[in-house]
Amino acid sequence: MSEKPEDTEIFEAIVAAAIEAGKVVHDIYRGGFDVQRKADASPVTDADNAAEAVILKRLREVAPHIPIIAEEEVAAGRVPAIADEFFLVDPLDGTKEFIQKRGDFTVNIALIRDRSPVLGVVYAPAKSSLFAGNVSTRTAFRSDENTDSSQTAPRRTIKVRPVPADGLIAVSSRSHSTPETDAYLAQCNVSDRVSIGSSLKFCLVATGEADLYPRLGPTMEWDTAAGHAVLVAAGGSVYAPGGVPLLYAKPTFRNSYFIASGTLIPPALSGRG
């Protein structure tokens, strides 16, 4: 997948946008917020809307020609036409974790090109941890960006780890575990299982802290695109049923089931999910 000349500028812009939006989210997290319900009964807070406004503004400044598919915009019925290239934005992934005052929620921003993520940033403001990946250059990094500081933290390269001989570490959803996930993991040589919210599951695999993340439950494209990009840039893969790559720009933006992994080639999923 070839890199475009403007990708470096866009990459740095989405890193900055994620940090700025994360500061907004964190300020609201430490203060107070209202919780409402969307048409699909999922929760939404002041932080979702405020962070999305920041991200939309920044992306339109750096790349006004690229459409943006953002979770709260879609919920409000504002869905632009897309072509080969568009942004996917989840301003607050892990809203349930946010509401319950657990720290594993993230800001997710990704650039999709030809149905695959090419740039992605996942920022966890409560943990001061940022993960970013450029798939075209196969480079991914982690930095500990403090939302209370204007200083930029050092960037440390991240890579998936080799398959361990003593068993896999699997990561799964804190809020959305399913019997199907349990059955799938029973096929694998899993020695430990970690539960965490949001796109941090992708990031644990990308940093070599875990080996496998099966998601046998519903997700939307904005939930996964940024973490997907980080993982692939770090040397991992994300498989849809049949062992094919998970693709984007689907008509409803709803994902199939998928398996994210490091160097492991996992057992294939059957069916569409």
Describe each model-derived feature in a short phrase.
Residues 25, 48, 59, 95, ...:
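Residue-level signal for inorganic ion chemistry
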Residues 83-125:
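Glycine-rich active-site/cofactor-binding loop and its immediate structural neighborhood
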Residues 109-203, 246, 252-273:
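Acidic beta-strand-loop-alpha-helix segment within the catalytic core
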Residues 1-92, 113, 179, 183-186, ...:
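N-terminal subdomain of lithium-sensitive/metallo-dependent phosphomonoesterases centered on the IMPase/IPPase/PAP
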